[in-house]
Amino acid sequence: MQVLIKRNGMKRSKFHRERKEKLATMPVYEARAVAKFVRISPRKARSVANSIKGKNVSEAFTILEFSPKKAARLIKNVLKSAVANAVNNHGLNEENLYVYTCYVNDGPRMKRIWPRGRGSADIIQKRMSHITVIVRDKEAEKAAKEEK
C-alpha cells in the first residue's frame, strides 16, 4: 500500500519523494535549450539539425556559421543557449561539450487564404517549428559510466 503525503494541497506518494531526492543527488552532465514557435518549416530545419548531431560544440558552431541556410542561424542561437545553460547552470566545461542530439518538431500552422481563379481559394499553411538542442559533457558522461 502506498503512503500518500499531502503537500500544498497535492497528494504525492513516498516513492515520488524518494525518486526526486535521488535525482537531486545524481550528477548532471547534460543541458538543453528549446526554441518554440520558430517561423521556419520543420522539413527545412531538419537537414541542418541532422548535420550537427554528435559533433563537438566548436565544430557545430563552425558548420552553422558557414551554412547559407536560415535554419542554421536559428539553430546556432539555440545551441548557444544550450551551451550557456550547461556552463552557467550545471558548471560543465565548454571544451568537453558535444551535441548529444538536435531535433526539430512541428509547431502549429498558420493558415492563410490564397485567392485563385473563378472565385475559388487555396489554403497556404505557414509552418512553425520547435527546435531542441541537448549538449552533453564527454568527461562527466564517462565518469558516470565508470561509477556504475
Swiss-Prot record:
GO CC term, one of those recorded: cytosolic large ribosomal subunit
InterPro entries listed in its UniProt record: Ribosomal_uL22, Ribosomal_uL22_bac/chlpt-type, Ribosomal_uL22_bac/org-type, Ribosomal_uL22_CS, Ribosomal_uL22_sf
Keywords assigned by UniProt, alphabetized: Ribonucleoprotein, Ribosomal protein, RNA-binding, rRNA-binding
Classification via Pfam families: Ribosomal_L22
Matches recorded under CDD domains: Ribosomal_L22
GO MF annotations in UniProt: rRNA binding; structural constituent of ribosome
Domain of life the protein comes from: Bacteria
GO biological process: one example: translation
Subunit structure of this chain's protein: Part of the 50S ribosomal subunit.
HAMAP family to which the protein is assigned, alphabetical: Ribosomal_uL22_B
Family: Belongs to the universal ribosomal protein uL22 family.
Function field: This protein binds specifically to 23S rRNA; its binding is stimulated by other ribosomal proteins, e.g. L4, L17, and L20. It is important during the early stages of 50S assembly. It makes multiple contacts with different domains of the 23S rRNA in the assembled 50S subunit and ribosome. The globular domain of the protein is located near the polypeptide exit tunnel on the outside of the subunit, while an extended beta-hairpin is found that lines the wall of the exit tunnel in the center of the 70S ribosome.
Protein name per UniProt: Large ribosomal subunit protein uL22
Encoding gene per record: rplV
